[in-house]
């Protein structure tokens, strides 16, 4: 940042008692924003540009910038407390899952028999130079790295093999034994198969799909101790970061991002993929202010793409794993019932509620507390009075706890040959499922769906929140909790891990390596 020395000295005052230096940082930051934007906008105009909701819930007299920071991202099964805009943790398969060998669509043998030749792919850890840490998950960190040959920037997601291969703890095993499993006994091999399947899920899904609102995968490889995914670097940071800094968002902004998220979810569902972990932490903003979904570690892909596989109960039409982030999980997931891709639309309702109100509809110390709140609240979550009727309507339609009454967005997405016939307007029965078209809802009246689904809207327009980016390598829109971390310990060739699981199946990670085509790489660089 460039400031005049006289201006800096003018803002400095000395406290004779404590010998402390006081600086008006808020003014410095505000002036820097104006400097980067090249305009002389007022402070009020800059706040409006960030799309802060005019009716935001007051935060005990504190400005949005002073909201409670997220807790440490160290792995935790359930958060102890979930105040507004505090980072939520996902429930992984080892935390709570219904293990059943008949429900697996990928086995270790399938992984080993992958037709990708490891030796044909030349990328390795030494091809990339670490710049800074962007985030941290249950299995490892996400680093911003630079290609030493081309200087291109990537987001490198690291997954520790030991976390995947080591057997579950006694507590986890006991918890699983208490789950109903249709008469089948759980064992470590089943749990390992499930963890391996989910490890390969993100690599497999991202290597097969391409959508403007979904992060891109360029390379993947592994060494003795870790798996690496080289992903598209999205410099605008997490939606969580912007919510934390600026409070709630206005309805126009929420409607725009709701359209982009739903467009990505609809695309995934047509490809037989259920996302299962929609939350602000997994939504990134690119340089133009458009939203991009990331982190597909908990996603599930049908064995037969979008086709229904009746022999595999855990396909897109019948999933069983208790997985995701409790505050955004559909009730049927938390209750351990069978569920389908419709669970993603409930999560969308939770995310919209969070953006508008400042917290998810239901919070609690664990998933049992949350499900109790959902069951006790027969009328659904309380919708704030200040929201428009259109926004109240879509929230009520998406947040139905009964799947039969929830809006089946995939079925009623847009006009097709089957539903293109005009229908007589009938009064909807109380509690009946919504049958109107999703894309024609009132809150989307300003959205050009053809441009959005084709990707042209993302290329030709700016989103409601355009991140301030002065240097891509600074990662200015990522939390300093992460960017201040050291990457030295995580960016070295580790010694081979020595656990029994490795000796039993030394090639179970074979086939993980991947390299995108040259034309694909040129398209995005």
From Swiss-Prot:
CDD domains: STKc_AGC (cd05123)
Catalysed reactions, semicolon-separated: L-seryl-[protein] + ATP = O-phospho-L-seryl-[protein] + ADP + H(+); L-threonyl-[protein] + ATP = O-phospho-L-threonyl-[protein] + ADP + H(+)
Keyword terms, alphabetized: ATP-binding, Cytoplasm, Kinase, Nucleotide-binding, Phosphoprotein, Serine/threonine-protein kinase, Transferase
Note: Present with 1470 molecules/cell in log phase SD medium.
Mod. after translation: Phosphorylated by PKA in a TORC1-dependent manner. Phosphorylation at PKA consensus sites RRxS/T decreases upon rapamycin treatment.
Localisation per UniProt entry: Cytoplasm
Modified residues (Phosphothreonine): 107, 490
Stretches with biased composition (Basic and acidic residues): 172-182
First-listed, main subcellular location of the protein, grouped into a coarse class: cytoplasm
EC numbers on record: 2.7.11.1
Modified residues (Phosphoserine): 90, 105, 321, 513
PROSITE patterns, sorted: AGC_KINASE_CTER (PS51285), PROTEIN_KINASE_ATP (PS00107), PROTEIN_KINASE_DOM (PS50011), PROTEIN_KINASE_ST (PS00108)
One Pfam family named in its UniProt record: Pkinase_C
Gene, per the UniProt record: YPK3
Protein name: Serine/threonine-protein kinase YPK3
Catalytic residue list: 277 (proton acceptor)
Binding residue positions for ATP: 134-142, 157
């Amino acid at each position: 940042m460039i400031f005049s020395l006289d201006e800096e000295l003018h803002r400095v005052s000395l406290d004779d008692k404590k010998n402390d230096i006081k600086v008006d940082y808020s003014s410095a930051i505000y002036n820097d924003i104006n400097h980067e934007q090249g305009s002389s906008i007022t402070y009020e105009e800059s706040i409006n540009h960030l799309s802060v909701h005019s009716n935001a819930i007051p935060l005990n007299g504190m400005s949005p910038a002073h909201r409670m920071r997220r807790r440490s991202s160290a792995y935790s099964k359930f958060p102890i407390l979930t105040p507004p805009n505090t980072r939520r943790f996902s429930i992984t398969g080892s935390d709570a899952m219904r293990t059943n060998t008949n429900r697996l669509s990928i086995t270790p043998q399938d992984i080993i028999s992958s037709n990708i030749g490891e030796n044909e792919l030349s990328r390795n850890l030494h091809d990339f130079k670490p710049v800074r840490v962007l985030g941290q998950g249950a299995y490892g960190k996400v680093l911003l790295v630079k290609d030493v040959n081309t200087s291109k920037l990537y987001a490198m997601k690291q997954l520790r093999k030991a976390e995947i291969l080591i057997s579950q703890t006694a507590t986890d095993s006991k918890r699983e034994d208490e789950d109903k499993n249709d008469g089948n006994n759980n064992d470590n091999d089943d749990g390992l198969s499930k963890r391996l399947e989910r490890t390969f899920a993100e690599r497999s899904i991202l290597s097969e799909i391409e959508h403007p609102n979904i992060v891109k995968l360029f390379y993947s490889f592994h060494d003795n101790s870790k798996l690496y995914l080289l992903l598209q670097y999205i410099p605008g940071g997490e939606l969580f970061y912007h919510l934390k800094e600026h409070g709630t968002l206005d309805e126009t902004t929420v409607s725009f991002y709701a359209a982009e998220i739903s467009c990505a979810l609809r695309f995934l569902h047509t490809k037989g993929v259920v996302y299962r972990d929609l939350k602000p932490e997994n939504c990134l903003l690119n340089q133009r202010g458009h939203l991009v979904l990331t982190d597909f570690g908990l996603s599930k892909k049908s064995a037969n793409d979008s086709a229904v596989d009746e022999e595999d109960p855990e396909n897109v039409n019948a999933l069983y794993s208790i997985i995701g982030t409790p505050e955004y999980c559909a009730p049927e997931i938390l209750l351990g019932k069978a569920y389908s891709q419709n669970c993603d639309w409930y999560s969308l309702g939770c995310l919209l509620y969070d953006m508008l109100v400042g917290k998810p509809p239901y919070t609690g110390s664990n998933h049992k507390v949350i499900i109790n709140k959902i069951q006790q609240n027969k009328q659904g979550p309380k919708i704030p009075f200040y929201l428009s009727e259109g926004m109240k309507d879509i929230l009520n339609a998406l947040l139905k706890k009964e799947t039969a009454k929830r809006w089946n967005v995939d079925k009623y997405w847009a006009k097709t040959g089957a539903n293109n016939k005009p229908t007589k307007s009938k009064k909807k029965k109380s509690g009946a499922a919504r049958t109107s078209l999703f894309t024609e809802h009132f809150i989307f009246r300003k959205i050009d769906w053809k441009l959005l689904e084709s990707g042209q809207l993302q290329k030709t327009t700016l989103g409601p929140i355009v991140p301030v980016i002065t240097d891509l390598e600074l990662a200015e829109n990522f939390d300093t909790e992460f960017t201040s971390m050291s990457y030295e310990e995580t960016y070295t060739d580790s010694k081979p891990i020595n656990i029994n699981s490795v000796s039993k199946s030394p090639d179970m990670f074979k086939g993980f390596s991947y390299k995108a085509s040259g034309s694909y790489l040129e398209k995005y660089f």
